[in-house]
Amino acid sequence: RGDKYRRSNGSFMTRDEFNHHLSNMLSGLFSLGGQPDHILIEYCVQFDPIFDNVSYKGVPDIRIIVFLGYPVMGMIRLPTRLSDGKANLHQGAIGVGIDIPTGTTRRGVFGNEPVKEHPDTEHSIVGLKIPRWDELLLIAARAYELSGLGYVGVDIVLDKDKGPLILELNARPGLAIQIANGNGLLNRLQRIQALEAAGTLASDPEARVAYAKAHFATT
């Protein structure tokens, strides 16, 4: 707006502050090991209006854990005032477990506490149907061939105009998704490992999604 830039939390920074931030990025302030870095300018996501009542300022994202091509667990991360509009659980966002077969949210975690409502909007975060869920699962399953990673967290955002967009592929996704779902990953991973041992892993992403929907419900 004018000579100012709007942050994801709604606040503004001046052009000088913006230039200083870019300089910090290039100098490696935010990179692993403090090495000089590059800047990638991305499209500004306009998140789907279904999330209006359960998100504070920023863009919610959906993480799906994929093991050997099978989507085994999912959650949506909802920004809060505490997280400053960022969908980051370690900074105070809410993690909400998603039932793989139906794409419906089941339970949430805020810090270490179970929650059923967003702390800022006071709207329920339980029973929310994620739009285009089957498409999201298929995108996640295909990320296996795309990345070559046996275990990967696929982070997806839902844009109101462009639909599902991959935000990033995370080779070391955190384990808080288990708390958000009230289920551990081990049994699900072992089930896929059994398929691998039997030589029956599916090569078709659609078949892998169908298997996940049949076996990985979050109650």
Segments (PLM) and residue ranges:
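C-terminal active-site "lid" helix and adjoining low-complexity regulatory extension at the edge
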Residues: 117-135, 145, 149, 158-219
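Phosphate-binding site of ATP-dependent enzymes
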Residues: 6-109
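Conserved N-proximal alpha/beta basic substrate-recognition cap immediately N-terminal to
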Residues: 1-4, 8, 140, 170
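Hydrophobic residue at the +6 position relative to the catalytic HRD Asp in the kinase catalytic loop
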Residues: 154-156
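Intrinsically disordered, low-complexity Ser/Thr/Pro/Gly-rich regulatory segments
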Residues: 96-125, 136, 140
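Short beta->alpha transition motifs characteristic of CBS
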Residues: 1, 78-79, 168-173
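Extended, basic/helix-rich recognition subdomains
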Residues: 64, 143-152
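Short amphipathic alpha-helical segments
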Residues: 17-21, 132-139
